[in-house]
């Protein structure tokens, strides 16, 4: 089969599709039950082409988690802006969504999945992930009116 030359725009569009489809599948069926094969087949590319975007499944997982961060912040803001919810109820609803994310379209990592991912990420990817995670948690706390400690 002849190789297809993809423009930078095509590659970026395909990469975004992989991340979006990955997030949809992971939110619906869980991270452990989502396979790389499901993702690349749904996007309509080959396994080899998938790995030109992501070296490992864990790299894809991390990118899907980055993609959902703004969605999580928006969800917190929506809860806090709801006059029908007390602060306590907003926090309770948020925590429930985090624990049962698949029902709310949020991909949630178990402790075991986190540990497995951390082992397989490069040192640089791990550091970037932790920094982005800390920023996310700080922003969540601030949206709930809790001053995040920057230490």
Enumerate the predicted regions with their spans.
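Helix-turn-helix
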Residues: 25-59, 63
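Basic, helix-initiating cap at the start of DNA-binding domains
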Residues: 1-29, 38
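Alpha-helical DNA-contacting segments of helix-turn-helix folds
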Residues: 17, 54, 59-68, 75, ...
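Amphipathic alpha-helical packing segments from all-alpha helical-bundle domains
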Residues: 70-73, 119-146
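Short, charged helix-capping/linker segments at alpha-helix termini
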Residues: 32-33, 146-150
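Hydrophobic alpha-helical connector segments
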Residues: 63, 74-104
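Short linear capping/connector segments at secondary-structure termini
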Residues: 77, 110-120
């Amino acid at each position: 089969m002849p190789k297809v030359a993809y423009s930078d725009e095509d590659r970026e569009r395909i990469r975004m599709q992989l991340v979006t489809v990955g997030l949809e599948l992971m939110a619906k069926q869980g991270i452990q039950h989502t396979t790389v094969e499901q993702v690349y087949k749904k996007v309509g590319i080959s396994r080899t082409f998938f790995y030109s975007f992501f070296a490992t499944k864990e790299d894809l997982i991390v990118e899907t988690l980055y993609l959902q961060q703004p969605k999580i912040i928006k969800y917190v803001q929506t809860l806090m802006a709801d006059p029908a919810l007390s602060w306590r109820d907003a926090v309770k609803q948020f925590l429930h969504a985090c624990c049962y994310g698949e029902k709310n379209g949020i991909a949630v990592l178990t402790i075991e999945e986190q540990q497995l991912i951390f082992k397989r990420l490069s040192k640089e990817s791990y550091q970037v992930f932790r920094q982005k995670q800390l920023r996310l948690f700080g922003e969540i706390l601030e949206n709930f009116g809790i001053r995040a400690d920057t230490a």
